[in-house]
């Protein structure tokens, strides 16, 4: 079934990015997704790069008919930091969802990344360096609402946290934390909001006036990083450096060094793409092999202050 015919059969998805190709083999119940070499080297928020988000939106629509999803992509000539992050995302998708796999033509690239980088060790996260800006922030922007949510009693409905803060850096480096050793894009790469509740870690991807499917890809990526920090210990912090107290990072560090039982990832939004339904979120949680990772949604009403819904 070609792309046009297949899209006509979907609910809540009128079109896909032009640089994402799909084909559905009805007889074998396999959905094929194709991504071009430009998209794998761009920010994962962009529609054409957010393969995870589109896969879930499509699969949840047709889960009775699809048994396998195969992702293929054109390998870029220059493998930049975005591409290395893309390989990590593919690897983690395959680890968490048994019906997903890269195409045969792309397996070698994934295995090389896994053997030479992911399981080779010496992967480090960066620390926060400076306090975030607090003055002259425009009202009704994501930065504004991010600060409005810095309240342990007003971050998730009917939930009180021990501590919460924002802008947790998630730059990944090999061997050493500096510009020359960056593995993924690191500049402004950060989890919008985080919180600790007993032995639970909560992370939040905040959006305002932004209904892109890429929010799924972003949240999953941050969940995978936290999983590799807290559960698998494939990523760690450089203990040779002093643990800063900026934005309560010392409290975060202390909590994740203990036994975190569950990691929650929350879509904190005023609105969502129509394909991102509660049924889709349930589907992600049901299909995910690691039941210690749970995705949730929290909507809010954006005014000068925020109100959870």
Region roles according to the model:
Residues 1-309:
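Charged, terminal alpha-helix-loop-beta segments
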């Amino acid at each position: 079934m070609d792309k046009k015919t297949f899209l006509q059969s979907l609910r809540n998805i009128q079109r896909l990015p032009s640089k994402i190709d799909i084909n559905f083999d009805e007889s074998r119940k396999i959905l094929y997704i194709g991504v071009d070499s430009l998209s794998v080297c761009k920010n994962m928020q962009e529609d054409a790069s957010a393969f995870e988000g589109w896969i879930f939106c499509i699969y949840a629509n047709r889960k009775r008919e699809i048994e396998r999803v195969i992702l293929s992509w054109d390998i870029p000539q220059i493998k930049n930091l975005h591409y290395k992050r893309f390989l990590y995302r593919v690897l983690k998708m395959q680890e968490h969802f048994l019906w997903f796999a890269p195409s045969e033509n792309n397996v070698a690239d994934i295995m090389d990344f896994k053997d030479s980088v992911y399981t080779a060790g010496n992967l480090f996260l960066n620390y926060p360096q400076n306090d975030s800006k607090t003055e002259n922030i425009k009202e009704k922007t994501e930065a504004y609402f991010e600060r409005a949510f810095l309240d342990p009693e007003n971050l998730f409905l009917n939930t009180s946290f021990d501590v919460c803060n924002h802008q947790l850096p998630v730059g990944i480096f090999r061997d050493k934390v500096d510009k020359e050793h960056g593995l993924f894009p690191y500049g402004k790469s950060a989890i919008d909001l985080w919180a600790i509740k007993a032995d639970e870690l909560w992370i939040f991807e905040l959006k305002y006036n932004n209904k892109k499917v890429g929010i799924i890809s972003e949240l999953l990526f941050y969940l995978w990083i936290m999983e590799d920090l807290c559960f698998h210990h494939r990523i760690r912090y450089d203990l040779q450096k002093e643990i800063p107290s900026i934005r309560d990072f010392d409290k975060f560090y202390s909590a994740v060094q203990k036994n975190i039982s569950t990691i929650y990832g929350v879509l904190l939004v005023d609105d969502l793409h129509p394909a991102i339904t509660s049924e889709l979120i349930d589907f992600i949680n049901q299909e995910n092999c690691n039941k210690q990772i749970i995705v949730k949604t929290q909507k809010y009403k954006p005014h000068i202050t925020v109100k959870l819904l």
